[in-house]
Amino acid sequence: KFEKNIVYNPKSELSYLYLSKIFKNFDNKKLQEQNLNTVILLNPKTEEAIFNLAKLKLESSDYKKSRELNEKLNSFCKNFCNKSKRLKSEIENLLKK
């Protein structure tokens, strides 16, 4: 369904966001990341996509990129501010180890 929507509306950031969630459920990190990057390309201020990509980078031990994405999110967040703060603590704790 989402893929069909993308064919008719290739700039539908929500379709890519939903696809990234589907790939997360299938544990396909490569396609999850690809779709999150597409969302951010279409709309660089999509909080959920930036947060999810930061989490994904953290899971793959890319602390630097995760922190960078989280700082970007924190600079304009409205809905994901609390999640961003928790993620910042999580990153800092992992960096201490």
Region annotations inferred by a language model:
Residues 1-8:
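N-terminal leader/linker segments that initiate helical-solenoid repeat arrays
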Residues 5, 38-39, 72-73:
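Canonical positions in the second alpha-helix
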Residues 18, 52, 86-90:
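Canonical tetratricopeptide repeat
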Residues 25-38, 60-69:
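Structural signature of tandem alpha-helical TPR/SEL1-like repeats
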Residues 67-97:
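Terminal, low-structured helical/coil segments at or just beyond the last alpha-helical repeat
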